[in-house]
Amino acid sequence: MICLPVVEDSVEKAIKTAEKYLEIADIVEFRIDMLKEVSEEDIEKFAKYPCIITVRADWEGGYWKGNNEERLNLIKKAIECNAKFVDIELREEKNKELVKFRDEIGSKTKIIISYHDFEKTPSKEKLVEIVEKALSIGDIAKFATMANSKEDVLNILEVINKYPGKIIGIGMGEKGKLTRILGVYFGSILTFASYKGKSSAPGQVDIDTLKEIWRLMDLK
């Protein structure tokens, strides 16, 4: 799957962009933390689309600086509305409570437990530890770490290969682009692409370029 991040500052623009993106991508990620204003009713609108709903906290590289309970309530609303995926940080102390809430109400939402490091990629052993911890909490483990070397790229792909269908593994930055191109081949459930320069993280490959590379390599 190819996911395009929706990085708009208003609900109206976000919905319009998502509809355009879904003509060329499999799924979108609504970056709720980048919106100037958002309500639970807006979350209900977003959840109708094939999407990941992410309200990324500022302490994990996001833009949400408001009340954390309000943030968690928006995620709960997405779960109530059966959003396809929600993303919750591994470092969020209440991530298990959100999974329990999902189970109690019988929601169909899949929960991604995510880890980010914008400076480096940990050792392969540490990455495995992170993935195991994330999978003990949610349905899918996601890690996005800065790739600074060929070794980082190899470690990321090896860890993805160990957990096919249960993981989203990403090497950020220019050196990490190979992980974005080959990650799905090794078992990542999706890769994040950019659209005409609009991206949510360093190193995202333009969707048209990504599709052309996959076509040339006979990857799907």
UniProtKB/Swiss-Prot annotation:
Pathway the protein contributes to: Metabolic intermediate biosynthesis; chorismate biosynthesis; chorismate from D-erythrose 4-phosphate and phosphoenolpyruvate: step 3/7
Active-site residues annotated for this sequence: 116, 142
Superkingdom assignment: Archaea
One matching Pfam family: DHquinase_I
CDD domains named in the record: DHQase_I
E.C. numbers: 4.2.1.10
Quaternary structure and partners: Homodimer.
Family: Belongs to the type-I 3-dehydroquinase family.
Binding site for 3-dehydroquinate: 29-31, 56, 180, 200, 204
Enzyme class: lyase
Catalytic reaction(s) noted: 3-dehydroquinate = 3-dehydroshikimate + H2O
Function: Involved in the third step of the chorismate pathway, which leads to the biosynthesis of aromatic amino acids. Catalyzes the cis-dehydration of 3-dehydroquinate (DHQ) and introduces the first double bond of the aromatic ring to yield 3-dehydroshikimate.
UniProt protein name: 3-dehydroquinate dehydratase
Molecular function terms, GO-annotated: 3-dehydroquinate dehydratase activity
Biological source species: Methanocaldococcus jannaschii (strain ATCC 43067 / DSM 2661 / JAL-1 / JCM 10045 / NBRC 100440) (Methanococcus jannaschii)
Entries under InterPro entries matching the protein: 3-dehydroquinate_DH_AS (IPR018508), Aldolase_TIM (IPR013785), DHquinase_I (IPR001381), Type-I_3-dehydroquinase (IPR050146)
